[in-house]
């Protein structure tokens, strides 16, 4: 078998394997997806927020004892399922099941890049497919499965040296949950370290300081500027309506958004109430 035929065979084998994992994962996640009935844990917030996004383009400030404390991207994804299947248990959980299933395929290809071994990649995907925590988050309308997907996709783009795309997906991760910022910082620091090691390996063929300064600027654009711009852009529905939380705090919408974010920050840093779902 010549190299061209071998490459084609590997490509088709990977495609068929990925399709098989996706079909199996989706079957596991869609089976009785509408059960249990009613809202599970924070579905009571996210499903309703997603429905509000679908109807009004923004999570409305309705004056009730409720505060929207997470960015909108994950809830927009939940809204897609509601748009297709209606405001019911299956509808608000569908996007989680779909994205969770796609993430199994993504994990397979990440493992291929890391191990370059078909069987290890299959084992990695299979273990994730059967993992209880992944399965539960793929069957509930919570934000964590979307956060995981965007972070994993960012890592995959880094493995492919598509750093600009990694920046965009990190922005979407941050716009799903703020905890994405820790991974953004880690990826940024990792790329700075990689650049430094590569320049050291060049044995001073070019001035290291000048080259590193240029690369630092590029990495800052890829892993700071692009994620921030992407993050702010995801709030477009909030910008385009007067009914969002704190939207009218200032005549300058950016100042209103900043104020809203300070309120969100205070909520997260001062939250001390206990609940029956928390871990020990």
What label would you give each PLM region?
Residues 2-241:
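Membrane-integral, polyisoprenol-dependent glycosyltransferases
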Residues 216-280:
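Membrane-lumen/periplasm interface segments of specific transmembrane helices
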């Amino acid at each position: 078998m010549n190299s061209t035929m071998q490459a084609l065979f590997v490509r088709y084998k990977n495609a068929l394997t990925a399709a098989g994992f996706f079909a199996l994962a989706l079957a596991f996640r869609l089976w009785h997806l509408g059960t249990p009935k009613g809202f599970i844990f924070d579905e009571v917030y996210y499903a309703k927020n997603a429905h509000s996004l679908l109807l009004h383009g923004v999570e409305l400030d309705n004056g009730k004892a409720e505060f929207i404390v997470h960015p909108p991207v994950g809830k927009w994804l939940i809204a897609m399922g509601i748009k297709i299947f209606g405001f019911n248990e299956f509808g608000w959980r569908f996007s989680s099941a779909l994205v969770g299933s796609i993430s199994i395929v993504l994990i397979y290809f990440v493992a291929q890049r890391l191990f370059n071994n078909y069987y290890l990649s299959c084992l990695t995907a299979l273990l994730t497919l059967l993992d209880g925590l992944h399965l539960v988050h793929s069957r509930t309308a919570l934000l964590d499965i979307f956060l995981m997907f965007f972070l994993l996709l960012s890592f995959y783009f880094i493995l492919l040296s598509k750093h600009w795309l990694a920046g965009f997906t990190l922005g979407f991760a941050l716009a799903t949950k703020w905890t994405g910022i820790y991974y953004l910082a880690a990826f940024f620091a990792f790329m700075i370290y990689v650049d430094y090691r590569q320049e050291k390996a060049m044995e001073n063929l070019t001035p290291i300081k000048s080259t590193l300064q240029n690369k630092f600027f590029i990495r800052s654009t890829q892993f700071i500027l692009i994620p921030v711009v992407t993050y702010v852009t995801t709030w477009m529905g909030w910008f385009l309506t007067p009914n969002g939380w704190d939207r009218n705090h200032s005549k300058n919408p950016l100042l209103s958004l900043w104020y809203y974010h300070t309120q969100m920050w205070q909520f997260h840093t001062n939250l001390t109430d206990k609940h029956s779902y928390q871990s020990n």
